[in-house]
Design a protein with these regions (language model features):
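K/E-rich alpha-helical interaction surfaces of small helical-bundle regulatory domains
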Residues: 13-32, 51-53, 59, 242-266
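Mobile genetic element proteins and their domesticated derivatives, centered on retroelements
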Residues: 14-15, 25, 45, 61, ...
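Basic, flexible linker segments flanking DNA-binding modules
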Residues: 23-118, 214, 270-277
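An active-site-proximal beta-strand-loop segment
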Residues: 116-151, 157-159
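C-terminal domain-tail junction helix/linker
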Residues: 201-205, 227-280
Length: 280
């Protein structure tokens, strides 16, 4: 305000009316003229935020900045995002496939031990559903607990057995022999089916199942589905179920190959998996 009025009044009069010391006025004037030292960092933060469609919070943006050779404390990134008004978007009814004991129930071999030192030692699988436009779409997926990477998936309009067996077939194609693998699921009817269990037996895969009604026994894939829905389903508008399906396929590719994870040292799951396999 003082700067605007200086053309009409002397600085001494303006400072006297404002009861502002001359030294304080010049200090603030100097600060205003200073270049914003975070200008380029802000531009990168905005770019990263929009490249990832608002899915990255300050911690993941901090990691991606490091990948771009920009080193800022995560609290600084958080503060800059607040100033820029960049807010990471927050996290549907879970699909229930349990229909009682319609086949053989496997023991809970995983027992909530989600850690593994190598790929292809512990996989988890589940089915989730999406209800849009009066229609339902089902996603069946397998994750490897080593890197949380998406090993295989199928998308279907009905929760049929082939949705799960086709997914398993695709996963088995990339599985080395003698892997000593555990594949964990809930007690859904598909996983109790003789055909599914025979496929596991023929490949030497140990079957593991959660206890009845205990979603925490399969928490990693439950969390994956939560991330998927919060970053895709709740963030975008879709024109049709076919449009949603296209975006779902694109998101699954994004999750595996471009979405970085802090616990993977800032790498996407598929890249982390490949590095581990190459080092073995």
């Amino acid at each position: 305000m003082i700067q605007k009025l200086r053309k009409e009044f002397s600085l001494a009069i303006l400072l006297d009316v404002a009861q502002l010391p001359r030294a304080t006025f010049y200090y603030h004037l100097k600060q205003l003229k200073k270049a914003d030292k975070y200008h380029s960092a802000k531009e990168e933060i905005i770019a990263i935020f929009h490249e990832n469609k608002g899915r990255y919070g300050y911690r993941r943006i901090t990691a991606e900045l490091r990948n771009r050779n920009i080193y800022l404390n995560h609290k600084t990134v958080q503060r800059l995002m607040q100033k820029l008004g960049l807010v990471c978007r927050a996290r549907m009814k879970k699909y229930r496939s349990y229909k009682g004991e319609v086949g053989k129930i496997a023991p809970n071999l995983l027992n909530r031990d989600f850690h593994t030192e190598k790929p292809n030692k512990k996989w988890v699988t589940d089915v989730t559903e999406f209800k849009l436009f009066g229609e339902t779409l089902y996603l069946s997926a397998i994750l490897d607990l080593h890197s949380s990477d998406l090993v295989s998936y199928t998308i279907s309009e009905r929760p049929v057995l082939s949705m799960v067996t086709t997914m398993l077939d695709k996963a088995i194609e990339i599985l080395p022999n003698n892997s000593d693998l555990i594949l964990h699921s809930d007690q859904g009817w598909q996983y109790q089916h003789r055909r599914y269990q025979r496929m596991l037996w023929e490949k030497g895969i140990q079957q593991s199942m959660s206890r009845k009604g205990n979603c925490l026994d399969n928490a990693v894939i439950e969390n994956f589905f939560g991330i998927l829905k919060s970053e895709l389903l709740y963030l975008q508008e879709f024109q049709s179920m076919e449009h949603f399906k296209q975006e779902l396929v694109a998101y699954l590719d994004y999750y595996n190959n471009r979405r970085i994870k802090a616990k993977l040292k800032g790498l996407p799951p598929a890249i982390h998996r490949q590095q581990a396999l190459s080092a073995a």
